[in-house]
């Protein structure tokens, strides 16, 4: 395409677009942002806006689409959610200042990982950008959040890369454009950069200049050992500089993260435990949505961070626990006060990049004053002492903002009335000129009436014609010679006088001067605030931490969470543990014990589908996870030994993008666990081997269980339907059988959801199918085939599946409506009698009594 064949404005656009070929360009044209050529076609499709044309190039109409500049944020938000980056090109020159088109330039680039505008961000989600730099041995990771100032780096390996990205939940991933770049499971939000931008030497130079130091050893980074991590951090910092058109002032140092800081969880574990997202991709009900009682958005984001980063440092955990205990009598008034706190963290970020708005500063001022009034009793908690000591440090900033910013400023700086009265004498004088014009006009009107003797004379103003003197048609002919005609109306004439024109010029000039001065003063306030960014970020972090800790206190008090104990020996002991999410979704939840130690490391868990095996296993993992965040846990008591990682293999689905079947996904996850789990790991395995034939599945499940017992020696919960596996405790002393009980009566089945010793006796598969609504004909056919299989199993001896039962007598007709014989009824009566015998009403707490009452009621219903 030839530039000479288009207008000067389009030539300017093409020059700007050539520098941003991989982005959509929002090109400012008056009150619109316009897009051209392929950008217009793509934007019209993504945003559902009209595609039209503007001008021609080489005789071909130029495709064009546009959005109003005042509504641009909503369109940008939609594009960013789709993973698009947008270059914002503004008019920076004066209209008509030269012969060519008004000067324009790209003032910022909006990308998924570098957002600071509140309209483009989810309130309760942290927005991170991650850079990935590989070499032959390691992968260097660096990540940052422009909202919080977080800036960290880490060394990892190829096999752990996807797990790290799942932990960080990156909105944008920077990758070198080279053949050595590893393949990622996610392709969304990926930005390719030239490989040379990840060079360690260039990265170290940029980082040392930014932090004002000679080398990076103070950050724990050695030039040779951490070269790829330094390269990633340098590429990331440079990318932020390029997209924001400035070097950010608020990145909070650079820290090197290691695996030993947090309990490890791979991507499958985070997904299966539904920490912040359900298996179906929803935000609720999840662990996060269930626990989030936070009063601020900052607190909610920190809570999500803590849930994804359970601590291993016992001292830090205990410090949080002590703070939670200290707040149990104070959390309600504290949360009431915190509800008045704005999102200081994100306001500070907008101050840092220079796009804070007037009401941001007003909200910051009010929030800092509110924080300074928080009065807490630390009750021996050193963490609370540290947190509450932060807030008085920001009082000088609050006082400055009180003096500088109107109590309720305008939304936009261009509308004026932002800088407070008394802050600047010249601005006050300019405002006086504008605001006291009414007095001048009244005085002028009275004076002119007296001078001219014209009774219809009025002095008025409108935005089109400015100031004027109006006379009726009958008196207009008597106007003095110094009255210059300005406008003729049907029944009146409007005039201007030299005195009124001089006043008009003064007022208009004062308005322009006041707006210009307000902008200058506002920019000065922002610049001064940038020097206080460390204190603001510190206050934001302290407020968020207080919010989360008070939420933990609320959970302890209102949901009967207890403080877990930590041991230095291998143990997971939980008394009457509850699933923190499920118990909020059901009327009655059955609590269960868990006992794992050096004598019992693997629990073989059997029982019917829908019996609660998966819920129980997840419950144990979530209690362990919560304990390591400093939160109290849903149980009567809990003692937990050293834990380094949590693994889960629960459920699976096809990975069509990678051409992997459900069974292949299952085996890949299992292999990862067997290669990485240690003696201090917690492993959840659900029905390993079910995706293939019975013999293959049984063999694989047996091998996996033995590997966990003999090699990994991890704490393991192993749910299975293979009866052969229940013999493992005979050969391995550290394995133990447990089952979830259920009862059948007539056509009904009752799931007791209670963990009991020993293996389950049968599957209840057909009963569950009946509950699911299978047709009677299909159920009868299933019962018939089950009996035939049982006959074959009895003849061939091997009993491969726990679903097998004793074969029926020859000649017996299968009866789908008869699930329980008299022996089972007697067995049930024995269970009920034993349960009643064991009850000691005087020793039960109200909650325990209620739980037992519901359980006995369910038992009675099953035989009624």
Curated annotation (Swiss-Prot):
GO terms for cellular component: cytosol. Keywords: ATP-binding, DNA damage, DNA repair, DNA-binding, Nucleotide-binding. Disulfide bonds: none annotated. InterPro entries: DNA_mismatch_repair_MutS (IPR005748), DNA_mismatch_repair_MutS-lik_N (IPR007695), DNA_mismatch_repair_MutS/MSH (IPR017261), DNA_mismatch_repair_MutS_C (IPR000432), DNA_mismatch_repair_MutS_clamp (IPR007861), DNA_mismatch_repair_MutS_core (IPR007696), DNA_mismatch_repair_MutS_N (IPR016151), DNA_mismatch_repair_MutS_sf (IPR036187). It holds the Pfam family MutS_V. It comes from the Bacteria. Gene3D superfamilies: 1.10.1420.10, 6.10.140.430, DNA repair protein MutS, domain I, MutS, connector domain, P-loop containing nucleotide triphosphate hydrolases. One of its GO terms (molecular function) is ATP-dependent DNA damage sensor activity. GO terms for biological process: mismatch repair. ATP binds at residues 607-614. Belongs to the DNA mismatch repair MutS family. NCBIfam families: mutS1, PRK05399.1. This protein is involved in the repair of mismatches in DNA. It is possible that it carries out the mismatch recognition step. This protein has a weak ATPase activity. This is DNA mismatch repair protein MutS.
């Amino acid at each position: 395409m030839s530039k000479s064949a288009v207008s000067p404005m389009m030539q300017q656009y093409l020059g700007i677009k050539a520098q941003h070929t991989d982005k959509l360009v929002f090109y400012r044209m008056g009150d619109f942002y316009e897009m051209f050529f392929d950008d217009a076609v793509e934007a019209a499709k993504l945003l559902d806006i009209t595609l039209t044309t503007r001008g021609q190039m080489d005789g071909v109409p130029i495709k064009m689409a546009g959005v109003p500049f005042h509504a641009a944020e909503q369109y940008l938000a939609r594009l960013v959610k789709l993973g698009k980056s947008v270059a914002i090109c503004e008019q920076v020159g004066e209209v008509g200042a030269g012969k060519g088109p008004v000067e324009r330039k790209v003032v910022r680039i909006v990308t998924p990982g570098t957002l600071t505008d509140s309209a483009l961000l989810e309130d309760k989600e942290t927005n991170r950008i991650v850079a990935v730099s590989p070499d032959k041995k390691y992968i260097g990771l660096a990540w940052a959040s422009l909202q919080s100032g977080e800036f960290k780096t880490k060394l990892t390996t190829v096999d752990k890369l996807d797990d790290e990205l799942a932990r960080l939940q990156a909105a944008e991933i920077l990758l070198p454009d080279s053949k050595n770049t590893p393949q990622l499971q996610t392709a969304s939000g990926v930005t390719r950069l030239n490989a040379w931008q990840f060079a360690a030497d260039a990265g170290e130079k940029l980082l040392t200049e930014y932090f004002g130091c000679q080398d990076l050893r103070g950050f724990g980074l050695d030039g040779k050992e951490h070269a790829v991590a330094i390269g990633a951090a340098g590429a990331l910092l440079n990318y932020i500089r390029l997209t924001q058109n400035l070097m950010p002032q608020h990145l909070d140092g650079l820290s090197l993260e290691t695996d030993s800081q947090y309990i490890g969880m791979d991507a499958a574990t985070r997904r299966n435990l539904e920490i912040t997202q359900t298996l179906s991709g929803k935000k609720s009900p999840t662990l996060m949505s269930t626990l989030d009682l936070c009063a601020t958005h900052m607190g909610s984001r920190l809570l999500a961070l803590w849930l994804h980063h359970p601590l291993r440092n016992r001292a830090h955990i205990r410090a949080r626990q002590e703070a939670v205990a200290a707040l149990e009598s104070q959390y309600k008034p504290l949360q009431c006060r915190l509800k008045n706190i704005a999102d200081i963290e994100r306001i500070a970020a907008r101050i840092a990049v220079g796009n804070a708005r007037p009401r941001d500063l007003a909200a910051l001022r009010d929030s800092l004053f509110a924080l300074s009034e928080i009065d807490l009793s630390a009750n021996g908690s050193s963490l609370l002492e540290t947190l509450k000591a932060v807030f008085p440090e920001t009082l000088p900033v609050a006082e400055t903002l009180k003096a500088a910013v109107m109590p309720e400023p305008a939304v936009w700086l261009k509308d004026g009335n932002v800088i407070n009265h008394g802050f600047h004498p010249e601005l006050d004088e300019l405002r006086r000129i504008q605001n006291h014009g009414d007095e001048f006009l009244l005085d002028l009107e009275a004076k002119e009436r007296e001078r001219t003797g014209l009774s219809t004379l009025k002095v008025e103003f409108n935005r089109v014609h400015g100031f004027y003197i109006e006379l009726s048609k009958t008196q207009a002919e008597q106007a003095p010679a110094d009255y210059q005609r300005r406008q003729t109306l049907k029944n009146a004439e409007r005039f201007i006088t030299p005195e009124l024109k001089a006043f008009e010029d003064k007022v208009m000039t004062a308005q322009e001067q006041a707006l210009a001065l307000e902008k200058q003063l506002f920019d000065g306030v922002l610049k001064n605030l940038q020097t206080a960014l460390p204190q603001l970020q510190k206050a934001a972090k302290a407020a968020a931490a207080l919010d989360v800790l008070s939420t933990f206190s609320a959970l302890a008090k209102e949901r009967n969470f207890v403080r877990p104990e930590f041991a230095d020996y291998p143990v997971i002991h939980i008394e009457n543990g509850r699933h923190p999410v499920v118990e909020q979704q059901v009327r009655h939840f059955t609590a269960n014990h868990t006992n794992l130690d050096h004598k019992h490391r693997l629990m073989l868990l059997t029982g019917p589908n829908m019996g609660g095996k998966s819920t129980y296993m997840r419950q144990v993992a979530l209690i362990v996870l919560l304990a390591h965040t400093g939160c109290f846990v849903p149980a009567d008591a809990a003692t937990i030994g050293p834990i380094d990682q949590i693994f889960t293999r629960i459920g699976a689905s096809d990975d069509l993008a990678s051409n992997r079947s459900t069974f292949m996904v299952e085996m890949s996850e299992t292999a990862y666990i067997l290669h990485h789990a240690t003696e201090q790991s917690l492993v959840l395995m659900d029905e390993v081997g079910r995706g293939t034939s019975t013999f293959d599945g049984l063999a694989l499940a047996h091998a996996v269980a033995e590997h966990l017992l003999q090699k990994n020696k991890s704490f393991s919960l192993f749910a299975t339907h293979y009866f052969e596996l229940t013999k493992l405790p005979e050969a391995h002393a550290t394995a133990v059988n447990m089952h979830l009980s259920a009862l059948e009566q007539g056509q009904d089945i009752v799931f007791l959801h209670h963990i009991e010793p020993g293996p389950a006796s049968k599957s209840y598969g057909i009963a569950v199918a009946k509950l699911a609504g299978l047709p009677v004909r299909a159920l009868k056919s299933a019962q018939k085939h089950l009996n035939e299989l049982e006959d074959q199993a009895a003849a061939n001896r091997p009993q491969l599946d726990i679903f097998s039962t004793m074969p029926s007598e020859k000649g017996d007709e299968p009866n789908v409506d008869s699930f329980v014989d008299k022996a089972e009824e007697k067995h049930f009566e024995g269970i009920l009698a034993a349960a009643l015998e064991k009850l000691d009403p005087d020793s039960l707490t109200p909650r325990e009594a209620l739980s037992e009452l519901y359980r006995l009621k369910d038992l009675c219903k099953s035989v009624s």
